[in-house]
Amino acid sequence: MSWQKGGYVDLIVDYRNSYLINHISLHDFEFKGIKNDYEKKYIELEIKKKSAETVPSSLSFQDVLYYEMTCCKFWGSGHHIICCNLMDTTNIYDKLLRLEQVEYAKSNSIDRSPMNLLEFIGVEIWLNSGDKLKVICKIFEFDDFLIWKVFEF
């Protein structure tokens, strides 16, 4: 088996292929900033690979149900991503359900039906400062994702 660099594509992850989150390598990407559109339930992270020739990329979260980020620099100064993982959402759902905010919330669908929490995924991004971003959303998108082709010999 051999690996060959393919092309760049937009990677879109939802609950059906959420396992891909654990296979995304964002190690050493520089975290440049965050944008939040509250009305659209949309968050975008601007990131940039260390190499100078790489243009900035972005990670976006759509249909955001929940997010939190620490900015304490627990491990000292730093703004590079260490890892991106699929996150267990159980504790956060428990907290929200105790407040009865999610259970009675309506989706943005035409019929205003109750939310289906099974359609949401949890994503956790660690920075080398020790800070962490947690997001629960329906869609996670990474533009300019490098695809590697596998060849059998």
Stretch-by-stretch model annotation:
Residues 2-153:
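Surface-exposed, interaction-prone regions used to assemble/regulate multi-protein complexes
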